[in-house]
Amino acid sequence: AAENYAHNKGIKIEGFVGYGQENPPVCDLMLGKSRFAGVGCEVIAAYNYLKYEGFEPDMAKLAYDFEKNALIAADGSLGSNPRKISGLFKAMGVGYKRFYKVDEAQAAVEEGKPVIVSYHIGLNIFSGIHTVFAVKEEGRLYVYNCYNSAADKTEVESIYQLMNKNSLFIVGYTEDDSQMR
């Protein structure tokens, strides 16, 4: 983790990461023995959420924290566990509300709240997962890192549009009521 932290510290990430994780410079960050290009979505979603909430997250430090506390496989090849985002937020003193249904994610964005959404891409738990940050901006819903090769944030009609009929919702996060704007 310390070696990756030193490597990641040398990669400058500015502003929100709206583009997909296969794009530079974020694709070259490391998580375990894996490049972010295939496994960094939870870290990117948490980074964007923190940025939106007014924090100044350090991507290298955030990746280090995920590597130490949230990897599914020790080598990072399976990314990180989206259910562990809550523990990282708690340790950082970040307020959040966790939910387990896509309807709750949709309701949160309709209320103007930012969300982190994690879901299985297919019908079984071995199909791979993706985790994204989504927020309404000027009445339009945008997803950051919507898919790995996205050139920028992606406009969608709803959270439901992210998932196909075979997708399984895993977990989501939004602001707790004390964070309302």
Please tell me what each predicted stretch does.
Residues 1, 9, 140, 180-181:
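Surface-exposed charge patches in extracellular/virion surface proteins
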Residues 1-74:
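Active-site-adjacent structural segments surrounding the nucleophilic cysteine of cysteine proteases
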